[in-house]
Amino acid sequence: MTVDRQMRRYSVPRLSFINKMDRAGANPFRVIEQIRTKLRMPAAAMQVPIGAEDDFAGLVDIVRWKAVYNEGTKGNVVRETDEIPAEVLELAKQKRQELIEQLSDVDDEMAEIFIEEREPTLEELVAAVRRATVACRFSPVFLGTAIKNKGVQALLDGMCAYLPNPMEVRAVANDTAVAKRLAAEANEAGEDVTAVQSTAQRGSEVQLVPATEAPLVGLAFKLEE
């Protein structure tokens, strides 16, 4: 919950990854419902699992409509096919429709497509997910089991496809040097420095631009239990 508050405070877009899909009792759709209710964030699965628990074999990409399998000793061989397993076909159709409905609640262009009762194209669906994610109005949810490298590549692809690049993010920093100088000048002039000191503590806001030749700016933080 603390991480969620910080992400909202700083307008950080998010993807969600439900790990350990090979564990007993794994239920990704219950987790997605908790994201919606407890975090109050519209969310929907981008995939449905093929098999469950020890029989977790792969994923159906409901955006590109492909079955994806990670094979090899470390799951590093990715095999895709257009043949969706019959046992998950109806679930995949249902979750794709759910994805479209969730997006139509937060994206105007997808809402128009939904009202027209038209099936969105791949490009329209990807664009809608990206717009809603970048705007911090939606979280696409990916599934997998990291230790077996299943679903990890799809998550990385999702980061590239749906999260903003540095040029799309408004990055700001606090320049305390200028504010402190103004506070010192006000103090020397015998003026009320209370307001200026308050500004000095938090610093004046400065817009940052990604540039290799610019000075380094970093954010240091500490996590505590």
Residue ranges and their predicted role:
Residues 1-225:
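Structural and coupling elements of P-loop NTPases
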